[in-house]
Design a protein with these regions (language model features):
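Conserved AMP-binding/adenylate-forming core of the ANL superfamily
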Residues: 5, 22-77, 81-85, 102-107, ...
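Conserved pre-ATP/AMP-binding loop-to-beta segment of ANL
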Residues: 6, 21-24, 143, 159-162, ...
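Structural core segment of the AMP-binding/adenylate-forming
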Residues: 11, 61-62, 85, 89-166, ...
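Conserved structural elements of the adenylate-forming
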Residues: 49-54, 182, 187, 201-222, ...
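Conserved AMP-binding/adenylation subdomain of ANL enzymes
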Residues: 209-225, 233-273, 288
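Gly/Ser/Thr-rich phosphate-binding loop
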Residues: 247, 269-277, 286-344, 355, ...
Length: 540
């Protein structure tokens, strides 16, 4: 009989449910959801374990074997966490998918991962239905009635769509944890695909176990009450908020999504003492109209990845908080700047046990102040490892020379403090997401009024370090009526929100090289010059 191991998610929850069955570990705030009358949802360790057993039994009943994959596509609901624990119990592999994903990106993710089924929110059913015909291996759908998508909820129980709620009403089964090792995979988290198709990072149970231990890195206290509105499909919400809370017994609060206007009210309502944010979120929060009670909140610490140096100290003063800055990626690499230490704008130094360097194109370490790629490996000198699902070549390139190649460009100062500057190759990072321009170009190119399109990035108006706004350079069909508003509408229909261009740049032609490669520098020069050809959603 295998000994239980808290590095395995299923074991952790089973043990905590035995120790503290009535402890209310999860709260899902539903302020502003639906008609505003929905009560918050709470899960104790005991209820979390019971529902995870029910979902695990449902996965096994649907024929999912060890290591087989299913999609998990929903906003922040308790059922998301329960499905994660269920995957660990059943030794299946979950594939978290942003619920805004649609079209070819959604189809590619499900197809590449070989998902046999999908657990989703009812508001995702239309997106899934639009691509289901191209996914012959997708045998089943378990849908959650969210209480906010009334028309979509009516689809549950029809056309191969089963009710997750019905599963959760079953008598509680006892599912023996089928995992054999913490190194068995728990999930495949797909990258944004900035340089091609998205790649699936295979994350073992032990990786989530390491997330659970990050509470010590972030300095969480025993009475901490964390909050996040970031999607649980994203590594940040799992690493900064969920993992440490489950492990340490912190009464954590989630909301369905991040809303800057309700952030502080949610923290006041639940007594939250810390929250997490990415990229341009800091500027969005700071841009809200000032209130007399801005600093009247229970938050002591904001765990940030990408706080703009320009507003860092003003943000702390206005809201009465301290900023804990950190850096990391799902593939690996972790650094942090303790509160009150190091220069403003730095993301810190690597955690103990990890080496992090700034290197040039030849792999030589850059001197202080010189920008190079951020790379990392174990401090023991062992080679870094990463596994991209079904992509051995990409896995090899990611760890060429034994170092994890982040693709991020940065520099260090003379005291070894590290700074992020931009994404290698000029890829677009917008509101924390790396944008695959090919998806954006495809949607715009299919618009009947568009003859040519090229998508690139410009420095974000938010000022967030490394962030860019999305520009779509467009040539319209000669003689055809052209409406920028209709292009924006098509983008909203075919893309997730972060992929929708910030600007449309209308041109007579897109400058290109002899090999038909668009010349971005000329487009950028024209954009910076302004003029009548630049449109935003408001101006269109």
């Amino acid at each position: 009989m295998r000994e239980r191991n808290e590095m395995i998610l299923a074991d952790l929850i089973t043990i905590r449910a035995e120790q503290r069955p009535d402890f209310d570990i999860l709260t899902f705030d539903r302020s502003g959801v639906g008609d505003g009358t929905l009560a918050d949802e709470v899960r104790t360790y005991g209820a979390l374990a019971e529902n995870a057993n029910r979902i695990a039994a449902a996965l096994i009943a649907r024929g999912l074997g060890r290591g087989e994959r299913f999609g998990l596509m929903m906003r922040n609901h308790p059922e998301f966490v329960e499905s994660m624990v269920a995957a660990s119990m059943a030794a299946c592999v979950l594939v978290p998918i942003d619920p805004r994903t649609r079209g070819e990106k959604l189809a590619y993710t499900l197809r590449n991962a070989g998902c046999r089924g999908i657990v989703c929110g009812d508001y995702c059913l239309e997106q899934i239905d639009a691509v289901r015909a191209s996914l012959p291996d997708l045998a089943w759908i378990l849908a959650l009635d969210s209480g906010e998508a009334h028309e979509a909820a009516a689809l549950i129980g029809r056309a191969g769509v089963d009710s997750l709620g019905a599963v959760l009403s079953w008598p509680v089964p006892t599912v023996d944890v089928r995992l054999e090792s913490p190194e068995d995979p728990l999930q495949i988290i797909y990258t944004s695909g900035t340089t091609g198709d998205p790649k699936g990072v295979v994350a073992p149970n032990s990786r989530f176990g390491l997330f659970a231990l990050l509470g010590a890195v972030f300095g969480y206290r025993p009475d901490e009450r964390p909050y996040t509105g970031l999607s649980l499909t994203h590594g940040n919400a799992q690493a900064v908020t969920l993992g440490p809370s489950l492990h340490m017994g912190l009464r954590v609060v989630f909301s369905r999504r991040f809303t800057k206007s309700r952030l502080w009210d949610i923290c006041r309502k639940h007594g939250c003492t810390t929250f997490s944010m990415l990229g341009g979120m800091a500027t969005a929060i700071y841009s809200e109209p000032a209130r007399e009670n801005d600093a009247d909140n229970p938050v002591r610490m904001v765990v940030s990845a990408g706080m703009p140096a320009a507003i860092w100290e003003s943000f702390e003063r206005r809201f009465g908080v301290s900023v804990f800055e950190w850096y990391g990626a799902i593939e690996g690499g972790l650094a942090f700047k303790p509160i009150g230490e190091g220069p403003i704008g730095s993301f810190g130094k690597p955690v103990p046990g990890l080496q992090m360097r700034i290197v040039d194109e030849q792999g030589e370490e850059c001197p202080p102040g010189v920008i190079g790629e951020i790379v990392s490996r174990p401090a023991t000198g062992e080679e870094a490892t990463v596994e991209y699902f079904r992509d051995a070549e990409a896995s090899r390139k990611k760890t060429a020379g034994g170092w994890l190649r982040s693709g991020d460009m940065g520099h260090r100062d003379v005291e070894g403090w590290l700074f992020f500057d931009y994404r290698k190759g000029g890829a677009i990072r917008h509101n924390g997401d790396f944008i695959n321009t090919s998806f954006v170009e495809k949607v715009i190119a299919e618009h009947p009024g568009v003859a040519d399109v090229y998508v690139y990035g410009v420095a974000a108006a938010s000022g967030a370090p490394g962030e860019k706004d999305v520009v779509a350079a467009i040539v319209s069909v000669p003689g055809a009526a052209f409406s920028p508003a209709s292009v924006f509408a098509a983008c909203h229909e075919g893309l997730e929100p972060n992929f929708v261009p910030t600007y449309l740049q209308i041109l007579e032609e897109i400058p290109k090289t002899a090999s038909e490669k668009p010349q971005e520098r000329f487009l950028l020069e024209r954009f910076q010059a302004g003029g009548s050809g630049i449109f935003t959603e408001k101006s269109s």
